[in-house]
From Swiss-Prot:
Active site: 50
UniProt name for this protein: Glutamyl-tRNA reductase
Gene name for this UniProt entry: hemA
Subunit structure: Homodimer.
Intrachain S-S bonds: none
Annotated NCBIfam families: hemA
GO biological process, one term: protoporphyrinogen IX biosynthetic process
Classification via Pfam families: GlutR_dimer, GlutR_N, Shikimate_DH
GO molecular function, one term: glutamyl-tRNA reductase activity
Function: Catalyzes the NADPH-dependent reduction of glutamyl-tRNA(Glu) to glutamate 1-semialdehyde (GSA).
List of residues binding substrate: 49-52, 109, 114-116, 120
Pathway as given in its UniProt record: Porphyrin-containing compound metabolism; protoporphyrin-IX biosynthesis; 5-aminolevulinate from L-glutamyl-tRNA(Glu): step 1/2
């Protein structure tokens, strides 16, 4: 078995292409179910955010897995594979594991050290678990990844200077307007990104805030937290007349603000400039609006310059986290290598228990007057003898599984105990069964 990541992200693709490959939250369950039925795919988790769409998969063959995951992406978004392939990054085995750790810890984010991605990875994994798209390997890997990411943020200072994309948008506004106290701010979208932006705006002194959302009650709840006002989206054109700063993140599939709408608004603004930041993917604001004289539009890719300001300090802390990742990878790979010994240990236990069962039957025939209590006591003690005898061989088998040449050594182990196990010790050939998937503690 192999671990594979197929990624389109802000490093490999511009926002115009990323928005074509963005899964909506409501369709993730169906998408993971569909991917799970693809040839070669044994487990999968799909992560889709404004900066990345990534497929994490356990596959039986790397070449086949790569092809069918690319095909799945192309088919799902009604594109040709040739259109998608140039924008993809592919990570395999150690590279895939390292990538997942780095992404979850915020080391691969546009804003290094941000914590929002940790919640997004965790949510995607839990949803994949619910639809039974994960199994033995990802249940363990994602548990370790989320645990390490939490530890990385608590044991380093990377979060102290890190910014979210929402905060970067606010920083850009402060550079242009300076004091935000007298600026009228309009927030489109009452989701996480919108609230993060509003939280940072409020912390920077903004007090004239209007929140708009398709569902007015959500806008009202968010506006109330920060002493703002809520309006229905039907009043958008009027709200644009009053705003100095607009930050938009609605998650709509079409432009919420068109060039035609903004052209009409500009005529009534009497030359007042409007600073617009579109942090949605797909974009909320028609990019053609940037051609208008009084509108200054920035999208999510334009925020990179703001992000770089604090990058050097955060990268020092990132080096510490990378060391933590490397240590955790050793632990995971050690665990992974022991999967090959599971059938061997099961076969050894089964053989020993079969001998114990045969012995009990023989004993009952020879001593037919045994009471039920006596049978129970004898059975308990004979099983105890078996457990004591197996303890050391099982420990040795686990040690052999992580040594060089594990396959040959475990094959010899199986021969010594006369065990019939196919491909003993070969992790890549162990049958992938969820029947023996361990339960995963709550994250």
């Amino acid at each position: 078995m192999h671990i594979l990541v197929v990624s389109v992200n802000y490093r490999t693709a511009p926002v115009e292409f990323r928005e074509k490959l963005t899964f909506q939250a409501a369709e993730l369950e169906q998408a993971m179910n569909t991917l799970q039925n693809q040839k070669s795919v044994l487990e999968n988790v799909i992560v889709s955010t404004c900066n990345r769409t990534e497929i994490y998969a356990v596959v039986d063959q790397l070449h086949t897995g790569r092809y069918y995951i690319k095909k799945f992406l192309a088919d799902w978004f009604q594109l040709e594979i040739e259109e998608v392939a140039p924008y993809l990054s592919i990570f395999e085995q150690d590279g895939a594991i390292d990538h997942l750790f780095r992404v979850t810890c915020g080391l691969d984010s546009m804003v290094v050290g941000e914590t929002q991605i940790l919640g997004q990875i965790k949510d995607s994994f839990l949803e994949a678990q619910q639809v039974k798209a994960t199994g033995t390997i990802f249940n363990e890997l994602f548990k370790q990844v989320v645990t390490l990411a939490k530890r990385a943020h608590s044991e380093t200072t990377i979060g102290e200077s890190a910014m979210s994309v929402s905060y970067a948008a606010v920083e850009l506004g402060k550079k242009i307007f300076g004091d935000l106290t007298d600026c009228h701010v309009l927030i489109l979208g009452a989701g996480k990104m919108g609230e993060l932006a509003l939280q940072n705006l409020y912390g920077s002194g903004a007090r004239k805030v209007t929140v708009m959302n398709r569902t007015l009650t959500k806008a009202e709840v968010m506006a109330e937290k920060y002493m703002g006002h809520a309006k229905p989206l039907s009043e958008l054109q009027c709200a644009l007349l009053e705003a100095d700063i607009l930050i938009s993140s609605t998650g709509a599939s079409e432009y919420v603000i068109t060039k035609e709408m903004m052209t009409k608004v500009e005529r009534m603004r009497s030359g007042r400039p409007l600073f617009m930041v579109d942090i949605a993917v797909p974009r909320d604001i028609d990019p053609a609006i940037d051609e208008l004289e009084g509108s200054f539009l920035y999208d999510i890719d334009d925020l990179q310059g703001v992000v770089e300001a604090n990058r050097a300090e955060r990268l020092k802390e990132a080096e510490k986290i990378q060391f933590m990742i490397e240590e955790e990878m050793v632990l995971f790979k050690t665990w992974l290598s022991t999967l090959g010994v599971v059938p061997l240990i099961s076969a050894l236990r089964d053989k020993a228990l079969a001998i114990q069962s045969d012995t009990m039957e023989s004993l009952e025939r020879k001593i037919p007057n045994l009471s039920d209590r006596e049978k129970k006591v004898i059975s308990k003690h004979t099983k105890s003898i078996i457990n004591q005898l197996l303890k050391d061989p099982i420990l040795v088998a686990k040690e052999l599984a992580v040594e060089e040449g594990a396959g040959e050594k475990l094959a010899l182990f199986a021969k010594i105990f006369d065990l019939e196990v196919e491909e003993a010790g070969n992790t890549e050939e162990v049958e992938h069964k969820r029947a023996w998937t361990p339960s995963v503690p709550s994250l």
